[in-house]
């Protein structure tokens, strides 16, 4: 619901990106990408699939709560996420 206050839409369209660091991976060579979008309806957490589409995921939520005993997540910028998606696009196209 838009209250008409300045910045309201910006808050609800914020996206945070996370590099997924699997076993023996680093921030320079992550194994995946996740994002959290803040919408008027609430948070939407997703992970990038090999076909470069986004699918709902509980990975960020579990990681925040300490329930994820798998990959580590590291917050990255939108620019870094774009560059990472391009790297995955090239890598997964092979």
Language model regions located:
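Short intrinsically disordered terminal tails
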Residues: 1-6, 90-94
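A general marker of short, structured functional hotspots
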Residues: 13-14, 34, 57, 84
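Short, mixed-charge low-complexity intrinsically disordered segments
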Residues: 42-94
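Broad, structure-driven detector of short, well-ordered beta-strand segments within folded domains
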Residues: 24-41
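Serine/threonine-rich, low-complexity intrinsically disordered segments
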Residues: 5, 17, 39-41
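A short beta-strand micro-motif
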Residues: 13-25
């Amino acid at each position: 619901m838009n209250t008409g206050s300045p910045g309201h839409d910006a808050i609800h369209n914020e996206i945070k990106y996370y590099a997924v660091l699997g076993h023996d991976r680093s921030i320079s060579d992550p194994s995946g990408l996740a994002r959290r979008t803040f919408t008027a309806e609430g948070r939407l957490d997703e992970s990038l699939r090999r076909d470069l589409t986004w699918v709902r995921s509980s990975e960020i939520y579990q990681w925040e709560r300490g329930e994820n005993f798998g990959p580590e997540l590291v917050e990255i910028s939108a620019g870094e996420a774009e560059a990472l998606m391009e790297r995955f696009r090239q890598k997964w196209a092979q």
